[in-house]
């Protein structure tokens, strides 16, 4: 199922989008909702602070939200950092990953505290696959260029950063992201996964329709393969920052859905 959130310049339309993202019935989560925890995993080239808008929207509605700071030094290190946070959750959680964070949650999501997965313009390899394989048969948009450093880490090309990563952010915000990049060990993209949590956990996907980090066909194909419920949002790859209400709404929907399923099965 695909939900599309369409933006227009009119204030009334903007208000409508916010209303659609957070219906009146979703002001706070019910006292008896089983899934009340959310764990957020950032992607490459950024850190966890970019989740602030999503964090605040979910906390306002009663969720306990934890943001993982993955080191981006290897898949194993990033998964270990995520598992460390999952171990601290007081109950079932929705695990969310953006971009490279999707690979991380795919591996870490087999943790028993994970009730569901949300992929935010994110990668979702299968067990035995690596991240680089997900690009096969697809063409990466020319705006997204990774500059390899001599020590094996990669940065996004600074001249193309805004166009490739955060085209819908303000010039100032995009410049700050560019200047505060966190490089990723490029070898991480070649590491094969041992687990694919989406094979046993329900999944949702946010697809940014103006994403220049991935080919749109690639995003759609990955979401279809994992059986994700898809929400399309008109945004750049930085959708988690530029459209936090829409992203938070999908996470909220996932938590409510998994909780309702648990109640029905009891």
What are these model-predicted stretches?
Residues 60, 64-94, 108-111, 132-136:
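Active-site loop/oxyanion-hole signature of alpha/beta-hydrolase fold enzymes
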Residues 96-101, 105:
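Gly/Ala-rich beta-loop-alpha elbow adjacent to hydrolase catalytic centers
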Residues 113-158, 185-192, 222, 263:
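Flexible "cap/lid" loop of the alpha/beta hydrolase fold
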Residues 205-207:
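Short beta-strand/loop motif that positions the catalytic acidic residue
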Residues 209-235, 241, 254:
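Conserved loop-alpha-helix segment in the C-terminal half of the alpha/beta-hydrolase fold
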Residues 33-75:
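Conserved HGGG/HGGXW glycine-rich cap/lid loop of the alpha/beta-hydrolase fold
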Residues 152-197:
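Conserved alpha/beta-hydrolase catalytic His-Asp/Glu region
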């Amino acid at each position: 199922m695909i939900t599309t959130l369409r933006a227009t310049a009119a204030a009334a339309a903007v208000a409508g989008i916010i209303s659609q993202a957070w219906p009146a019935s979703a002001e706070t989560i019910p006292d008896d909702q089983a899934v009340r925890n959310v764990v957020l995993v950032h992607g490459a080239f950024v850190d966890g602070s970019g989740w602030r808008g999503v964090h605040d929207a979910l906390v306002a509605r009663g969720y306990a939200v934890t943001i993982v700071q993955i080191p981006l030094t290897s898949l194993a290190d990033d998964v270990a950092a995520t598992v460390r946070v999952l171990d601290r959750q007081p109950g079932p959680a929705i695990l969310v990953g953006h971009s490279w964070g999707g690979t991380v949650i795919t591996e870490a999501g087999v943790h028993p505290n994970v009730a569901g997965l949300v992929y935010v313009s994110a990668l979702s390899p299968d067990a035995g696959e690596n991240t680089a394989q997900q690009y096969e048969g697809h063409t990466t948009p020319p705006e997204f260029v990774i500059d390899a450093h001599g020590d094996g880490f990669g940065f996004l090309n600074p001249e193309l950063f805004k166009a490739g990563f955060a085209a819908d952010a303000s010039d100032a915000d995009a410049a700050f992201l560019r200047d505060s990049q966190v490089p990723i060990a490029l070898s991480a993209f070649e590491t094969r996964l041992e687990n694919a949590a989406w094979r046993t956990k329900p999944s949702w996907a946010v697809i940014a329709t103006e994403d220049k980090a991935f080919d749109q066909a690639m995003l759609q194909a990955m979401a279809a393969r994992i059986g994700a419920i898809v929400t399309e949002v008109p945004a750049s790859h930085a959708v988690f920052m530029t459209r936090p209400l829409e992203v938070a709404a999908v996470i909220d929907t996932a938590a409510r859905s998994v909780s309702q399923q648990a109640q029905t099965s009891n």
